[in-house]
Regions:
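Short intrinsically disordered terminal tails
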Residues: 1, 196-197
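Conserved non-catalytic scaffold segment of RNase H-like nuclease domains
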Residues: 1-107, 130-144, 148
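Acidic, Mg2+-coordinating catalytic module of metal-dependent nucleases/exonucleases
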Residues: 84-96, 129, 133-196
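P-loop/Walker A phosphate-binding loop and immediately adjacent motor/lid segment at beta-alpha junctions
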Residues: 105-109, 179-181
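Short alpha-helix plus adjacent loop in nuclease-associated cores
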Residues: 111-131
Length: 197
């Protein structure tokens, strides 16, 4: 088992893993090396206008791409080497992959940068009684991510790089929280991830 983690992202024809299909799958390691990146040709859908407006992946772009069945063993070879999976709304991507035959380790830990970022950004959602989940573009902008360095937003490889950047910032940037202990003001240095726990 490697003592590292992977960042994964997908682009899909819609939001329902049982009905919609993968259009792109990207996986990078914690150092930014590309482990897998491919467009995926759907086998049931021939158009996805609503999703295309968001991810800009047209039917023509995936027409000559492999199907998920043709690449799932390559994806599984990667997944079985990592016990930590990072993503932005990671369960969405993991569910789509699992529905298509992906085999994550039973012991895999999932780190969701979206859920970690929500209390840092601090926008409260009264209806849910919790912090509002923010878009990846919001989280990346908050930390000053330069999209031009890699792909654009809503391309799964570009989203992997942005997620890696945000996840790293959440876990390495520190803030000084001041507390009064025994009558003395003391500064405690914590990462945002430590503060949100």
């Amino acid at each position: 088992m490697e003592n590292k983690y992977i960042v994964l992202d997908t682009e899909t024809t819609g939001l329902n893993a049982a009905e919609d299909e993968l259009l792109q799958v990207s996986i990078i390691d914690n150092e930014g090396a590309v482990l897998f990146d491919s467009y995926i040709k759907p086998t049931q859908h021939t158009e996805w206008a609503e999703a295309e407006r968001i991810n800009h992946i047209s039917p023509e772009m995936v027409a000559d791409s492999p199907t998920i069945e043709e690449v799932i063993s390559e994806i599984n070879d990667i997944l079985k080497r990592y016990d930590k999976i990072v993503g932005y709304n990671v369960r969405f991507d993991a569910d789509f992959l699992k529905h298509n035959g992906a085999e994550f380790l039973n012991t895999a830990e999932y780190a969701d940068a979206m859920k970690m970022f929500a209390p840092i950004y601090g926008e409260w959602n009264d209806q849910r009684g919790s912090y509002k989940w923010q878009k990846l573009t919001t989280a990346a902008g908050y930390y000053g991510y330069d999209w031009s360095a890699h792909e654009e937003a809503h391309n799964s490889l570009g989203d992997c790089y942005a997620t890696l950047f945000v996840y790293d910032k959440i876990n390495t940037d520190t803030m000084v929280i001041e507390r009064v202990i025994d009558g003395k003001r003391v500064g405690i240095e914590l990462t945002p991830a430590e503060i949100s726990q």
